UniProtKB/Swiss-Prot annotation:
The chain crosses the membrane at residues 53-69. Coiled coil: none annotated. It comes from the Eukaryota. It is a single-pass membrane protein. Residues 91-259 form the TNase-like domain. Disulfide bonds: none annotated. This is Probable endonuclease lcl3. The active site is at R142, E150, R190. Ca(2+) binds at D147. The gene is lcl3. Its main location: mitochondrion. Residues 8-17 have a biased composition (Polar residues).
Amino acid sequence: MRWPPWASESQAQQHNTKPPIEHNEKEHGSKSKSWESSVTAIDWAAFAEPRTIIPTVILTSGFLGAFHIHRRYLRRFPDAGSITPSHFRRRSLLGRVTSVGDGDNFRLYHTPGGRLAGWGWLPWKKVPTSKKELRDKTVHIRLAGVDAPELAHFGRPEQPFAREAHQWLTSYLLNRRVRAYIHRPDQYQRAVATVYVRRALDFPIPFRRRDVSYEMLKQGLATVYEAKWGAEFGGEAMERKYRKAEWWAKLRGTGLWKDFRRNEKEWESPRAYKTRMGLEEAVQPRVESKK
C-alpha cells in the first residue's frame, strides 16, 4: 500500500526498503566494533601470559647472544686496518701464515675460532692458497720487539744475515697456524704483535708454545728493536726477556753477532743500516740536482 497516498509507487518501495538497510548497517557496525575490541583484549592478555613471555625472552636472548659471540669471537678481519681498537692489548688473532715478506714480518689469514669453528674441514671454510684469492684478505703482521736484517728492496743493498733470517722465519712459520697478540698498528698499516707458534717436531717438548721474536733473538737472527719512537715489546717483562736473549746471543757470537767482537766498530745493526740508508737517500737527490 502506498503511503502517503499521493506518493508514487516507486517512492513507496524505496521508503519501505530503507529501514532494513540502515538496520543492517548498524548491526554490522556494532558487530565489527565488538569483534575488534574482543580481539584486542585477547591479544594483550596472551602477550602477558608466561607461556608467551618465556619463549620470547629465550629466543631474543639466544639471538643477541649468538650475535655477540659472532662479533666478539668469530668475526674475521681481512686486513690490519679492519682490526678494531678493542682487540689491541686485549685479544689475539688465530690464523695461518700464508707468506713471509722479510725477516720480521709476514702475512696472516685470520681464521677466528680455528678448527672448532670449522676452519680446515668445512667446505666453505678453507684457507685460500693462490695469490689472487689471498689478495686484500690477509693481515700484515710485524713481530714485536725485534728488528731483523733488511733484504734488498727499493734499490737498497741486502744486509748481512738478511737472507738467513728470512729463510729461518719462512721455515718456522709458513703454512703454520699461529696466534698473534695484537698491540697496536704501525705507520705502515701493519699490526705489531707478539706471535706464538706450536710445532709438532719441537724438541724436547712437542707442540710447546714458542715466542717467535724470542726464538729469533736466541738464534742471533734479529736484534732488540732500537728505534726511539714506535718500539713495542708487549710490556716491560717482555722487553727484559728479549734483551737477555740478545745478550746471550751476542756473548756466544751467534748469527749476526758472529763478527761483533772482532770488528765491533764496523759492525752495523739493522737500525743503524736503516738510518744510514735514509741519510744516503736524502743526500743523493741534492747531489743529482747540482749536476
